Every structure is written in C-alpha cells, then in structure tokens.
C-alpha cells in the first residue's frame, strides 16, 4: 500500500482563494481592507524569505501589507513602542513579529505587548487561554493548518485517537487544544516519552512536531493512519550536493504504511502563511463587529 499524499500546494492555494473572496466581500459590503503588519528585526536570511512570501501573498489576497524593518541592535523599548503604535493603528488588523528575535530582546515581552485582537500568530497568553477554554481565539497558524489538512482526509475528527509528538508553545500545545475542540482523543508526547513507538502505533492521527529529522519511523505508524509532518529539517545530502529538507517522519518508510501523509517540503509549511491570511481576515471581522468570515 502506498499512502495518499496530502498536497499542501493544492490545499493552500484553495484556502488563499477563499480568503481573497472574503476580502473582496468585506471591502464591497463594509468598505474595510484587512491589513497585516509584519515586523522584522535583523536580517536573518530565512526570516527574509518568509517575510517576502507573506508580503506577496497578503497583497495577492487583496489585503494591505505593511512591513517594518528594524536593526538587530534595536533597543527593546523602541520595538515595544512600534508595537504600541501598530496596536493603535485602525488600518492594521493583524500584527506579526517575525521570530526568533536577535539576542538581547525579550520575545515574551514582545508577544505580551501585541493586542490580543491583532495577534495573528496566536501566541499572546490571552489567545492561548481562550483557545484552552474553547472560546474564539486567533490560533497559531501551523496548528490551524494541520487541522485543515487532517480534515482533507477525515470530514470529522470526532472520536479519533490522535497523538501529537512535540510540546512547543508554537505547535504542539495549541494543536492539542484544537484537537480536543474537535472531540478527538489526544495523547501529547515528546522525545522523552516512554515507548514512543508504541504510543504512535495506537493513533489514527499522527502529528509530528518534534524537530528531529526522520525520528518517527515507518514501523511506528498504525496501518492506514493519517500522518501530518510539521518538521522542516535541513540535512546534508548523501552525495555532497545541496542540503535537503526532510520532516520529522521517515517519509519513504511511512508512506508504505500510512493511509495518508503530508510530504516535506510541499506539506504543512505551505499552509502556515495561508492560515496567517485566514487569521488576518478573522481579526479584521472581529475588530469591526462583523460575522465570522467563511474561512
């Protein structure tokens, strides 16, 4: 058996098209243009690529895109002052500070300073608490993308056994909350969990977000399970050429056992920016007291 490939390119394109349609509707019906402000501190090459992608996709969706670039040695107070300015700006509905920040800056203080109503990364403790309480919240983009991809295979996740391997604030913990809100039965595990292979073999849904290249092997997967691989790891090429990207799952092994699986690259990573656009539209609608958009 060879697993169905859950194609992030196709799914993210469909999601961006739905976002663009909602943006057009909000503009036409209410005269509001959703706006996303991205703050980049320093010049990390990977962050530069990601910010360019966000800017391009935001504009393609018909939204306003604002970029704010600060030097790596910017004082904390200056960064917080910029966030306060964006919090008060009525044309900005979403604020994202590109992480990680350079050394010397307090990421937690920066995240705490973002207005929860504009926190499109979903990392402010207010949004984390609302999510845990089952209330409306802006949700971290990668976990949201994981749920959307799982629902491409299963119309409902209710009653399914799910395992989340990884416990980060960015992916693992919010993903657990989203799965609980879908009425799945959830196990959260990590690299130090006892007998992790046995835990994985019990799961109908495996979400790998541990940050270790190909840690989850094919014989850890229950036959027919759905595997969502969040990992993006750069590893040396065996032939000495360009480094290659691999996930947290041994893809070649797992696809012979799983019922459906996301590839790396071409899977969850493409959903992250698409879900950022979703959060920006949701934030704009909530700020202006509009009904929740159809995305």
From Swiss-Prot:
GO terms for cellular component: cytosol. Gene3D superfamilies: Leucine Dehydrogenase, chain A, domain 1, NAD(P)-binding Rossmann-like Domain. Keywords: Amino-acid biosynthesis, Histidine biosynthesis, Hydrolase, Methionine biosynthesis, Multifunctional enzyme, NADP, One-carbon metabolism, Oxidoreductase, Purine biosynthesis. It comes from the Bacteria. It catalyses: (6R)-5,10-methylene-5,6,7,8-tetrahydrofolate + NADP(+) = (6R)-5,10-methenyltetrahydrofolate + NADPH; (6R)-5,10-methenyltetrahydrofolate + H2O = (6R)-10-formyltetrahydrofolate + H(+). CDD domains: NAD_bind_m-THF_DH_Cyclohyd (cd01080). Its EC number is 1.5.1.5, 3.5.4.9. Belongs to the tetrahydrofolate dehydrogenase/cyclohydrolase family. Catalyzes the oxidation of 5,10-methylenetetrahydrofolate to 5,10-methenyltetrahydrofolate and then the hydrolysis of 5,10-methenyltetrahydrofolate to 10-formyltetrahydrofolate. Homodimer. This is Bifunctional protein FolD. It comes from Rhodopseudomonas palustris (strain BisA53). The gene is folD.
